[in-house]
Amino acid sequence: MFKMVSSPHTHSGKLTAHIMLWVILAMMPAFFTQIYYFGFGVVLQSALAIGTAIIAEFIAIKLRGKKPLNYLSDFSVALTALILAMAIPPYAPYWVIIIGTLCAVLLGKQVYGGLGQNPFNPAMIGYVILLISFPLQMTTWMPPINLLQEPPTFSDAFSLIFSGLTTDGFTLSQLTHNIDGITQATPLDSAKIFYKSHTQLSDFYELIKLPIFMGNGTDFAQGWWQINVAFLAGGIFLILKRIIHWQIPVAMLVTFFCLATATAFTGFTHLSAISQLVSGAMMFGAFFIATDPVTASITPRGKIIFGALVGLFVYLIRYHGNYPDGVAFAILLSNICVPLIDHYTRPRVSGYPTKGRK
């Protein structure tokens, strides 16, 4: 007697835990690059996020009457926490990452039934809730630490996150007071605010000469483009390992680049398309967030449509919206469209005629 089982009858051989660990490994170049340019805050934020995520997931699974260890061992909750920790400002107050992680795990994942059931990317749910609820804390970034006279030590980072002061009693803003033209905003924030209030091209050229953009006089938005390149390298690694598919990141980046380039021909509007690609969370979102296998499209054509849709939304938000980045909102808006995309891009079943043929 043979036991009848439903399709599919093939298996990729990749366990969920192995996939999650490969993704975490691919994020390490960007993780250490962020430490190099912005200090140890991301280490502490990651530890807080992962610890909070494990506790929240353990309790949620226990309340559902299941065995927590069977679910925690897939490392998916650790990856969600790490993504969120790397997305927020490194020196945000400790309660910000705790609230965001709880929202990501409980509202973004467990409320739908756990891994594989959630329609939205959990980390982006947590991030957007934080951005809307605590805009000041979520937009206060320290400039690259090489611009500071006294870069914060690990002890300073710990003290800043938990008390708002360094071990010497300085606030985050006081650490940057000696740098001309420095604000506690990202280059994308600064460029967008400046563009809306200044229309002269010469004025904008003066902006990008400030230290946060030029650093030692050669780097545009130093720290940010290096982190984006590190995410790009990690993303290419995942594609080569066949952990993620190329369609989503390529479609997203190409769509955004084409739209941004076309906009540039209409006159001075914003940063160049290349500058946009290596700023903010563009590469992070393209390779590590939009490619989430649970919340992204699963059909070959659907992946291209989904990626292009994310790129379109990022363009609309960055160029015409109020938020300077827009990657998180773009991914969540595209997640809404996934069921419709998959419905209309399902591959033809073998043996059935193509549409329009008998």
From Swiss-Prot:
- Compartment list: Cell inner membrane
UniProt signal peptide: none
Q: How does it sit in the membrane?
A: Multi-pass membrane protein
One Gene Ontology cellular component annotation held by this UniProt entry: plasma membrane
Q: Determine the domain of life of the protein's source.
A: Bacteria
According to its UniProt record, the EC number is 7.-.-.-
Q: Which residues cross the membrane?
A: 19-39, 41-61, 79-99, 125-145, 220-240, 248-268, 271-291, 297-317, 321-341
**Its Gene Ontology biological processes?**
electron transport chain; transmembrane transport
- Mainly resides where? membrane
Annotated positions of the FMN phosphoryl threonine modification? 186
Q: Which UniProt keywords apply?
A: Cell inner membrane, Cell membrane, Electron transport, Flavoprotein, FMN, Membrane, Phosphoprotein, Translocase, Transmembrane, Transmembrane helix, Transport
> Needs which cofactor?
FMN
Q: How does it assemble?
A: The complex is composed of six subunits: RnfA, RnfB, RnfC, RnfD, RnfE and RnfG.
**Family according to the record:** Belongs to the NqrB/RnfD family.
What does it do? Part of a membrane-bound complex that couples electron transfer with translocation of ions across the membrane.
What protein am I looking at?
Ion-translocating oxidoreductase complex subunit D
Organism of origin: Haemophilus influenzae (strain PittGG)
